[in-house]
Curated annotation (Swiss-Prot):
Lineage: Bacteria, Bacillati, Bacillota, Clostridia, Moorellales
GO cellular component, one term: cytoplasm
Gene Ontology terms describing biological process: translation
This protein's UniProt keywords: Ribonucleoprotein, Ribosomal protein
Protein's name in the database: Large ribosomal subunit protein bL36
Family: Belongs to the bacterial ribosomal protein bL36 family.
Source organism per UniProt: Moorella thermoacetica (strain ATCC 39073 / JCM 9320)
Gene: rpmJ
UniProt keyword annotation of tRNA-binding present: no
Length: 37
């Protein structure tokens, strides 16, 4: 899980979602997981 000021999808399978008001990227590839904060 990477914590970044701006989250962007890296590949086609990356999905940008909102959980508890935080923007996150979830993906099949665990290296692509990102959280805004």
């Amino acid at each position: 899980m990477k914590v970044k000021p701006s989250v962007k999808p890296i590949c086609e399978k990356c999905k940008v979602i909102k959980r508890k008001g935080k923007v996150m990227v979830i993906c099949e590839n665990p290296k692509h997981k990102q959280k805004q904060g």
